[in-house]
A protein has these predicted regions:
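Juxtamembrane intracellular "pre-TM" segments in multi-pass secondary transporters
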Residues: 2-13, 194-226
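Helix-loop boundary and gating motifs at the non-cytosolic
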Residues: 10-59, 237-247, 251
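Residue-level signature of mid-helix packing/kink "hotspots" within the transmembrane helices
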Residues: 59-67, 155-156, 266-274, 358-359
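Helix-to-loop junctions at the C-terminal end of transmembrane segments
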Residues: 65-78, 272-284
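C-terminal ends and interior cores of transmembrane alpha-helices
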Residues: 88-103, 295-307
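Cytoplasmic helix-loop-helix junction between adjacent transmembrane helices
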Residues: 114-151, 333
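C-terminal membrane-cytosol helix-exit motif in multi-pass small-molecule transporters
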Residues: 180-202, 391-396
Length: 405
């Protein structure tokens, strides 16, 4: 429990540089390369389908490494896990930058993207675990919402930094921006003090350490109820990234118009994360969880009804607002229900479920679109928002006794 003295003396500003700086830099590194990975693959001789697959390797690497990431964090601690993840990502991006010179450049690029995804899993989990334990519960949602928002800002800045570098160094310039950003993230992360974790009981005898299996079994009720809401929310979020450009293309808009709509939606997204975190800290998580999913679900249902630039823009802004206020929600709920012993394992399982939803959302959109058309596919993803809201409305009040505060 947090003492009153800690609450009075704690300030997010006091940990801002060490806590959020590496996340901003890591986001810039990721954002710099995301627009060019497919182009690099095409230059190396990949078909369109293979190029798309290589892009998805980042997400797949992150998804499947969430569980091992919890063990890495347990073994090396938060600080060295964060530093190591940034170093590994930087080395992978350096390999990607030189893939055009390698005999099997396409394979090197693919392997590099897997490592970037794996590094992101370790970095994200260790960062979340660190803030969960370093920040008083009364500030938890604000801290984790800010963490999510800062990462989004970094991913937003990254493509512009990459584009500037490509003017001088060609397509490899984007990767070198990523290398520099990851190196800076690693150096800044060295200033993070390791936390004394409660994984070992007082008295020095560690006893039997919690395992992924034991944590999954003991918290099955949380994973199978609230975890379903997290899975649905993640599917909803990932679908929106695909829906906006696809519907813009369906309406016959050019790439510039589609990019403008997408960018404005992202700008709204980045403006509201801190007020949303403050609301969660003061009123409760459901005050953000339910409205955010309802807003995104409603906006997605409205998109097939739009027929103009203005109509799609308004729907996209609504999506951006809904997504923005949910920034940090997945991490906050994971922190709330994670046990003191086995927190890393719990968060690994939690993030695995979230990434499963992120992978499944576009798959649902693709499947329904193939069976019917794009409009029904988008509507199907919108229904996910209402399903997620229903889960949160029912489950959050019932699981209050399972929280760690």
């Amino acid at each position: 429990m947090t003492s009153p003295d800690q609450l009075q003396t704690f300030s997010l500003r006091s940990i801002a540089v060490a806590a959020f700086g590496p996340t901003l830099l890591f986001g810039i590194g990721q954002g710099a390369i995301l627009p060019v990975v497919a182009l690099s693959a095409r230059e190396l001789g990949a078909s369109v389908a293979v190029a798309a697959l290589i892009v998805t390797l980042i997400g797949l690497g992150s998804w499947f490494f969430n569980l091992p990431a919890s063990l890495v964090t347990l073994r090396f601690g938060e600080r060295w896990s964060i530093v190591g993840a940034a170093v590994a990502a930087g080395l992978a991006l350096a390999a990607a930058a030189t893939s055009a010179l390698a005999p099997n450049g396409l394979w090197l690029l693919a392997a590099a993207m897997v490592v970037v995804g794996m590094s992101g899993a370790v970095f994200g989990l260790a960062r979340q675990k660190y803030l969960t334990e370093a920040v008083p519960v009364a500030f938890r949602a604000r801290a984790l919402s800010t963490l999510g928002g800062v990462n989004r800002i970094g991913v937003f800045i990254g493509p512009f930094a990459g584009a500037a570098a490509m003017q001088f160094f060609g397509i490899s310039g984007a990767y070198w921006v990523g290398v520099v950003a990851m190196a800076a993230a690693a150096l800044l992360s060295l200033t993070i003090p390791d936390l004394a974790t409660p994984d070992a009981p007082l008295g020095g005898d560690a006893g039997s350490q919690p395992t992924l299996r034991s944590v999954a079994v003991s918290h099955a009720g949380v994973f199978l109820s609230l975890g379903m809401g997290i899975l649905l929310l993640s599917a909803l979020r990932s679908s929106r990234q695909v829906v906006i450009p696809l519907w813009a293309d369906h309406l016959g808009m050019d790439a510039t118009s589609a990019s403008l709509i997408y960018g404005l939606s992202g700008a709204i997204d980045m403006l509201v994360f801190y007020p949303a975190g403050r609301l969660m800290d003061r009123k409760g998580r459901q005050w953000v969880a339910i409205p955010s999913t309802l807003l995104m679900g409603t906006a997605l249902l409205l998109i097939p009804l739009t027929g103009s630039f203005v109509g799609l823009l308004l729907a996209a802004l609504l999506i951006g607002f809904g997504n923005g206020i949910s920034s940090g929600l997945v991490m906050t709920l994971g922190a709330d229900f994670s046990p003191d012993r086995g927190r890393g394992q719990f968060l690994g399982l939690w993030r695995f479920m979230a990434d499963a939803g992120s992978t499944g959302g576009p798959v649902l959109l693709s499947g329904v679109t193939a069976l019917a058309s794009l409009g029904p596919g988008i509507s199907a993803t919108g229904v996910l928002g209402f399903a997620a809201a229903a889960v949160f409305a029912v489950v959050l009040p019932r699981l209050k006794h399972r929280r760690n505060y």
